Structure formats: C-alpha cells, structure tokens
Amino acid sequence: MVVEKRNPIPVKEAIQRIVNQQSSMPAITVALEKSLNHILAEDIVATYDIPRFDKSPYDGFAIRSVDSQGASGQNRIEFKVINHIGAGSVSDKLVGDHEAVRIMTGAQIPNGADAVVMFEQTIELEDTFTIRKPFSKNENISLKGEETKTGDVVLKKGQVINPGAIAVLATYGYAEVKVIKQPSVAVIATGSELLDVNDVLEDGKIRNSNGPMIRALAEKLGLEVGIYKTQKDDLDSGIQVVKEAMEKHDIVITTGGVSVGDFDYLPEIYKAVKAEVLFNKVAMRPGSVTTVAFVDGKYLFGLSGNPSACFTGFELFVKPAVKHMCGALEVFPQIIKATLMEDFTKANPFTRFIRAKATLTSAGATVVPSGFNKSGAVVAIAHANCMVMLPGGSRGFKAGHTVDIILTESDAAEEELLL
C-alpha cells in the first residue's frame, strides 16, 4: 500500500476550502411548527407596524397628560373613571377633562388619552383616583410602529429559525415558511475492531461509539440520518457502501480508515468515487488526519476513529458544511473569550482543541479542561460543553490566561444567579 502524501493546512483554511465549494440545497415550504432550526430561504418583511396601535404596557389608567400638570404630594389631582377595557378591547369613549379609562396591559390607548398612570401610582376610591406627579405626553405608552414599521426586514434570508423567529413568523401570519431543505447524512463506522452496542466484548475489540455519537450530533442539527452497518477493513465493500450512501444522501461521514495504517482505505475509496480531496491533513490536535472530499455537490468527511478527534472534526468541519449548504449567514464556528482556571502544560506544536467545561460568571466566562484529554478519550466529551482552542507554537498555558473557546453545547451554566 502506497502512503499518500499529506501536507497539513491551518484549520481556518480547511474550513474555507469546504465552504468554497458549490453546494446548495433547494428551498422547500414547511409548516411553521416544523421550521425550528431550518434556514430561512427568503427575507421576511413586515406587512404592518408593531405595535399596530398605541397601547399600554402596564395595567393602569389612560389619561390626558395635560390634566396631570401641577400634581404633587401636596396637590393631588383627581380623575373620574369613565370606562374599563382589557387587552383586545377598544374603548368607545373619548377621554375628556380629568377623565380616565381603566386599561389593562396590551389594550389600545383610547381616543383623547396620551399617557398611562400605573395602578401603583394612584390612590383609588370607587370610580375616582388621585395622582401625586405630573405625566408627560406618551409616558408609559408603547407607540405604534416603535419596534417595527411596515416594510422593515424583520428576518433575513440565511438566518437560523430559532424560537424568537418562530414568534415573529407567527406574528405576521406565516402558517407555512419557505426554508432551505436540510441535507441528509450517511454515517458509516469502519474498522474490523468494532462491535455493535449490544455485542459482547471480545479481546482486541471495542464497541462502536463514534457512529451513535455522530448520529446524535447530526440529529441535534435537525438532519435526517442514515446509519449503515459497521464496515470491516475491506476496500471493495468500503467502496460499495460509500457509493450506495452517496446515491441516497447529501453528506457521507465515515469514521476510521483515514490514517496511514495498512488497513486505512479511505484515500482509495475517494479515488474510486472520483471525489476531489480538499485536504487530508490539518495542522491541529486531535484530528490531524481529518480528510474531506467533494464530488457532484456532495461532501465526504473522513473523520478519525478516535472519539475525541471524531467529535472535533464534526464540530469544526461538518457543521460549517451543513450551514453552507443551507445558505446560512454565519458558517464559521463562533469563538468567545474565557479565563483558563487550570494549568495546561502540554506543548502545542499545532493548534490544539481541548474538551472543556465553560461557566459564565459575573466577571465573564471561565473554562476548565474536562478530564482526560487524549484523542482516543470518550468520557471527557460527555462532560464538556466547549472546546478550548490553543494556538500552535505555544508551550502550555497557566491558569488565569485568556483563551479562545468554541461552545459546543448551550448549557454553559452560570456560577450564580446574576441579578
């Protein structure tokens, strides 16, 4: 077997090569309740103002501000209540001299009124109340169009539909939404040493953990996943299953078979399917032998058989590819700063990614490596919610150093409730 030449490239360049490929998914229409985590296929433009009318943000009384002038603790001014309305109701009364309408949160401001007095700012007595301070025009009023005006772009094409976007779409009556179809993913674990989850352990064998992990990572993105039978180290069967997966899926992910061992056949498989290898070595640890190929608008990811390296490869390279195929506005991993709370003394000839646990505090984010951090480690992944990114050419970092982290989970818990 001829060992393929590998020239390492930086992580950023590897991601850029992925997103430079011409690969896009078609637009489809889905029900609003099925649109979460999809990418919008078009701008959403406001068809009316929000709020649609001047409304009260509080429970209280709608008054004419001019009638409140001169009010003080020594000169309380009295108002007569002429009507009572709740949200969804409109008063048919015109508020006149020293008159008021009892109004609930969200209700439309009645004609004649231009300020709202909160209940707690009054002393009530039957159908009257008094106030002890003056109010200005439009005080305590949410004005028509103050949030959004007709014609404003309220959601952009390429934006991820999150729960907030769902609320906006519902507000403007989108029972169906035009989105980009999400790619389907094939997951193929390779290696004669692999056993299925329910198999009894044998000497020299390990259970397939990467396949279920990748499936979970893909399903977390809302992707349709096809799981293929674990492949033994055989070139012909490997070519056959990859070809089959390419016919049915937009992305094919294999784990294992990407190194330079006697039974690592992935380079030969890529040649057989006429895929262009975008890169086959990345200047990083773990996952340096991560390989990505491309053919006919489809991505083929060769991730390491080592669990931590496999996880890192998915986060750094598969996620951006999925976002790119769906036309997302942001495709690169988002990086934030955090304070390292433990020494990490290992030298880093290449960019190193460490599984870690981030915590949000009043002073900012802190991060602690999550246990054993070799490429074959699996338990550390379960206790991590981020990856620390240490630059190449460094000789370790002391506690207190500011580092870059990539959040991989949304459970970066607060150390304390920040009020």
Where are these regions (language model features)?
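Short, hydrophobic/aliphatic alpha-helical segments
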Residues: 36-49, 90-102, 292-293, 297
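Helix-rich terminal scaffold detector
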Residues: 3-11, 175-303, 307-313, 419
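Short, glycine/charged-enriched hinge/interface segments at domain edges or termini
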Residues: 2-5, 11, 17, 61-232, ...
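Flexible glycine/proline-rich
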Residues: 28-33, 42, 88, 148, ...
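Generic structural signal for well-ordered, non-membrane alpha-helical segments
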Residues: 7, 11-15, 28, 32, ...
